[in-house]
Design a protein with these regions (language model features):
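Feature captures the FAD/FMN-dependent oxidoreductase FAD-binding
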Residues: 72-153
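N-terminal Rossmann-like FAD-binding beta1-loop-alpha1 element of flavoenzymes
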Residues: 3-31
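Surface-exposed, flexible loop/turn segments at secondary-structure boundaries
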Residues: 1, 16, 37, 50, ...
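Glycine-rich active-site loop/strand segments that organize a redox cofactor
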Residues: 35-87, 110
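Core residues of folded domains in eukaryotic genome-function proteins
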Residues: 4-7, 25-27, 38, 57, ...
Length: 158
């Protein structure tokens, strides 16, 4: 019997979704993004004059500094999108993103039986006690699909 591995689902390819995908890349997560691009709220800014209200050095991934980190300017939304795109390309996380895939429902089904797990110890860290099973309904441009995923927000210190 082939090993059964949990699939990690991440909702949204904004700042947090990209960071989670990078941290969980060794588990091949599936990122559901409702739109056709990354960036979350920064992609859909209503005003071209929108800027971050923090300095760029305070709004950066710890392992991917801004190229002009010491600038005292407040980045525009286009600069933030460029930064997020550079981050996603640098860490090769776009391959995990399923664009135009809106999560419309999530249901908890309970625990799988321990006999369902045949992976080696250490293949996957315990996220929750037991072996939870979730069903995620995703609406795409083509059809509705179901993915079984395990939540990721229970990892400390992502």
């Amino acid at each position: 019997m082939a090993p059964v591995f949990s699939k990690i689902g991440i909702i949204g390819a904004g700042v947090s979704g990209l960071a989670a995908a990078k941290q969980l890349a060794h588990h091949n997560p599936l990122v559901f993004e409702a739109s056709d691009s990354i960036g979350g709220v920064w992609r859909h800014c209503s005003y071209s004059s929108t800027k971050l209200q923090s300095l760029r050095c305070d709004y950066a991934f710890s392992d991917f500094p801004w190229s002009d980190r010491d600038s005292t300017s407040f980045p525009s939304y286009t600069e933030i999108l460029e930064y997020l795109t550079s981050y996603a390309n640098h860490f090769d996380v776009l391959k995990f993103v399923r664009f135009n895939s809106k999560v419309v429902e999530i249901r908890f089904f309970g625990d799988r039986e321990a006999t369902d797990l045949t992976g080696k110890p250490g293949d996957y860290p315990t996220i929750l006690p037991g072996h939870p099973v979730w069903e995620v309904a995703v609406q795409t441009n083509h059809s509705d699909t179901i993915e079984v995923v395990t939540p990721f927000f229970f990892f400390p210190f992502l």
